[in-house]
Amino acid sequence: MVNISPPPDSPAGLPDWLASFTNWEKQLPLDRGRREWGPLRCRKLLDRAGLSTDSCKVIQVAGSKGKGSTVLWLEALLSIRGCKTAALTSPHLISLEERIRICRNPVPFEKLLPGLQRLYPALLAGQAAGDPLPTFFDLWTALFIEIALSEKIPYLLLEVGLGGPLDSTTAIPHDVGILTTIDLEHTALLGDTCEEIAAEKSKIARDGKPLFIASGETSAVSAEIATSRGAIPEICERDPRIPEEVSAIQSTNASLALRALDHLWPESPLTSEETTLAWNQLELQGRLEVIPGPPELLLDGAHTPASIRAFVDEFSRYRDRFNRQQGFTGSNLKSGALLLGMLRDKKPEETLSELKRLNPLPQICTLGIPVPRGMDGEAIAEALVPVTAGSGITPVVAGSPEEGIDWLRKMAAIGEPIAATGSMYLAGMVRQAWLPASQA
């Protein structure tokens, strides 16, 4: 039995109190043995707190990339219909408050604390009965449900934090499952190939419930797993209701969101006009986001081979547009500057190899992200050797995030188009440094 102290009375004490609960997100190695019991711990806590989602419609979103964007699409589309939503997402860009949103707005710590205090008796009862100690994610998921129910929110949107069937969110039975694009990530936990990862993540599928699957190389594997679990799989192609200007990546996410809501509203599907309104409202922070500055910056949290591939395509367009606007031609064309930061469990060599498609290669600065899973800047530079070979580019290694961000500003000052990518953690740090506090 662990002695759990009461939640703090003020936001200042919350980080230390939360740190007393195991956080898989901050630990290495992430292997199969360390993830067992995930949903069972959370389920026990929910039951002891008397928290039931039977009165709500629950949509669970798993996948390798596009989960957060799909949740944003769901929020926007639901808001067009005047529906109240609660969204549980991870990771956050700047503040932990971002991980729980009510009607698209982060819930401030001042409102989270009463929810934790209401959960505290259930935590104590569980320890007295010999329940396993909940992890940070178990606790945060239960807090999300507590807050959503107290606000009488009818639509709950759950972004799977890691994997699928072992994630804390799987303690909550969903009405609709979504599987976004699959890519190589967390291979020690999920599998060594995209097919193995797809098979693992597809296990969120529930008997008798639909699983909407992003079309791709692994979608057939996912559909097979879903069928074996009694779910109703549907592989989703690009939906014709989506505006033509929406990128391929966001079209995939929007198509999944639309089909999920079509299932909930079979008599009144969303229209093209409503989808366009949702697109116009969408704020995709840290996802191929252009921050006006000055100086202007292309910011992206890409961290898998496919998402870096999309970043490369966008950076090429961004750089070409910059050179045209500045009137640079021939030998005066600017190659740009790129700040890179990654996590250690993201297959860096394979992911970064996509940068070879940039011709010419931009100047590069690497930095270590200051989290336990962060990859050292020197190690990132070493992983870049096959990319930079023969290019004349030698990556600069920043000694700190501040130094890396300062390098970006200096490159902008000499007229280079600038960008940052490699991790949502990096995107959050750069965004906070780039924007005034009121806008970050």
Name every feature range the model reports, one short phrase each.
Residues 88, 210-216, 337-341, 362-371:
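Short internal beta-strands
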Residues 1-63, 70-81, 88, 127-128:
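Short functional linear segments
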Residues 155-158, 168-170, 174-178, 182-183, ...:
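Nucleotide phosphate-binding/pyrophosphate-handling subdomain across enzymes
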Residues 216-234, 251, 296, 352-417:
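C-terminal helical cap/extension that packs against the catalytic core
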